[in-house]
Each structure stands twice: as C-alpha cells, then as structure tokens.
Amino acid sequence: MLQLTPLQLFKNLSDETRLGIVLLLREMGELCVCDLCMALDQSQPKISRHLAMLRESGILLDRKQGKWVHYRLSPHIPSWAAQIIEQAWLSQQDDVQVIARKLASVNCSGSSKAVCI
C-alpha cells in the first residue's frame, strides 16, 4: 500500500459524500454499506464507488461478513491524517451524532431492520 499523502487525503475529504462517510465511521467505528446509504441518503452504487476510493487511498479498511461488507477507518493512517479527520469530526460533531443516533436504531446488525441491501 502506498503512503497516504496530504494531497490524497484532501482530495478524498473534499467530496461531501466521502467526508460524510469518514465522519460517520469516526463516530460509529464500523458500518456496512447499507447503513451508509441510509445515513447519507445515497444509492448503493454511489456509496460503493466512494468507499472504493477511500479504501484504495488507505483511509478505510473493509471486511466481509456474509453478504455484507463493513468499513472502518484504518488504524494505519498517518497521525497527521488522523488529526485532520479528528478536527473535521469535532467541527461537525453535533450533526454527525444526530445521524448516528438515527442509525443506531436501524442499522443492519440491529433487530429492527429485516433486510440489508
């Protein structure tokens, strides 16, 4: 894996959808694709495309569990990048937490949702 550069990080975070993904994962730890689709009100192909970009840059890690793919922030990102993500999260913390609370009651691993797309 290539080393994450500042230019790569800022290019990734300059998109509203990718920034939203990163901030939600910072708040919640790990989410599946369907949770991110619901939280950001975006289609699965669009979210998957953005997740692939974040994964390829080394910002995210994924793991498969049955038919679901779960994503989380990589613990291997440089400390300077983690600090930037943390500052972005702090500036949007209230908004992110509102979305996180809604997701907590309906995420795909919870019992209130029968099918995850």
Curated annotation (Swiss-Prot):
UniProt entry keywords in alphabetical sequence: Arsenical resistance, DNA-binding, Plasmid, Repressor, Transcription, Transcription regulation
InterPro entries for the chain: ArsR-like_HTH, ArsR_HTH, HTH_ArsR_DNA-bd_dom, HTH_MetalResp_TranReg, WH-like_DNA-bd_sf, WH_DNA-bd_sf
A biological process term (GO) from this entry: response to arsenic-containing substance
Domain HTH arsR-type, residue spans: 1-92
UniProt DNA-binding residue ranges: 33-52
Superkingdom field: Bacteria
One GO molecular-function entry: DNA-binding transcription factor activity
Presence of keyword Hydrolase: no
Pfam families: HTH_5
tRNA processing is among the record's keywords: no
Subunit-structure text: Binds DNA as a homodimer.
Biological function: Transcriptional repressor for the ars operon. ArsR is a trans-acting regulatory protein which controls its own expression. The repressive effect of ArsR is alleviated by oxyions of +III oxidation state of arsenic, antimony, and bismuth, as well as arsenate (As(V)).
NCBIfam families listed in its UniProt record: HTH_metalloreg (NF033788), PRK10141.1 (NF007528)
Record protein name field: Arsenical resistance operon repressor
Species in which this protein is naturally found: Escherichia coli
